[in-house]
Amino acid sequence: MAGPDRRILPEASPRRDRPPPAHATMLSRFFAPRPRRFLLSQLLAGEPGLAGAFTWRTNRLPAALPDPLWLHFGCGENVLDGFVNLDFLPHDARVAQWDLLDPWPAPWPRPASGAFSEDTLEHFFLAEQLYILCELNAALAPGAVARTLMPSYARLVEYCRGFAPRPGEFLHATFGVETEADAVNAGMRFSGHRWLHDDASLARLARLAGFEAVKTSCAESTVAFLSNRNLRAEEGSAAFAHDLVKRVAIVRTTLAPGEIRGIEVVETVGEAIAFGEVREAGARVSWRLPHPVPAGEIACVNARGANLSAFREHSLKRLVFRGPWGEGAWALDETLKSKACMNLAMPAALALACGGADRVVEEIALEPGRSGDRVTIGPLEIFAYAR
């Protein structure tokens, strides 16, 4: 082929370039740019809202607190005078930001005289509700009342029995439901509803958190200051109301991880949140309790830590409880949590995992995922009854 053609079609001409020396190849590999390592700090800086699903930050009370101290949780736009109004998405300068699943202050500046919430607790799963009530117990003075209004499961089922669509009916007009079962499902889930109660189930939940549930009307509380604060009434809604009276004090203990096994920690961000990658099968984060505790004396356990890699598996984590009797595990369901870093166990889970409520727990561990998974690691929160 002639010279001009070689310039136009160089690929048609055989290459006569010398191969690079062996040492040059080695050096190019050594100095070649490596893929950037994913860091949680970068996600926090660039997308703090997304990173917040895997991290946490201790809630902060306003600097100036009224005396007496009355708390209003999940206030939305219903700002109440005489209360410290708290909401995860403040719409008003009078409202302080508060994520009910982030750690609460400890100790509190002073015990709260009481609390009020309406249409709030049902937006969390059952174990999360227990966590919230345990934190609330620790914030309240002895005998104080946490007033709670929410939709009643029993009243919802009764309303939906024999459901048939009709003009102007809320569930049909808003969600297009046309059958009884669909109406019940819509009522339990719309607007972020996650777990409804009847009188019996709420009383049990309250008892686990050290409260006695006293049924009231939606308007009248056993505490005058908490009466007539309601937005909804029994007429025209499924609402029901209870005063949760603090009967047994609950104490929260927070422990830093004692051992991190099979996980390469890459960095630490925020409030001592470790971020790393699982390197071995059977990786664990362990917390040694200050002293042995019978499983039946523990109201709630939360091992903080999220898995950022596995979104299709719902049972990849386990809580492991150890004592002189041996070891028992409780599988965690990722679909039953509002926030990825919450790894909760209720009293029934503790008793089942340990083989009895009388068995003593000395150590708790979290198995956070499989090899290659990126995870956050935080403290263990134990809520125990102050007998």
For the regions a protein language model found, what residue spans apply to each?
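Noncatalytic modules at the cell exterior or secretory-pathway interfaces
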Residues: 298, 350-367
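Glycan-recognition and processing domains
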Residues: 248-292, 311-314, 325-326, 331, ...
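Membrane-proximal basic amphipathic "stem/tether" segments
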Residues: 1-66
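S-adenosyl-L-methionine-dependent methyltransferase catalytic module, highlighting the catalytic core
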Residues: 128-131, 135-141, 145-245
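Conserved SAM-binding loop
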Residues: 66-158, 242-247
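Extra-cytoplasmic beta-strand recognition segments
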Residues: 285-314, 319, 342-346, 350, ...
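Extracellular carbohydrate recognition and processing domains
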Residues: 324-357
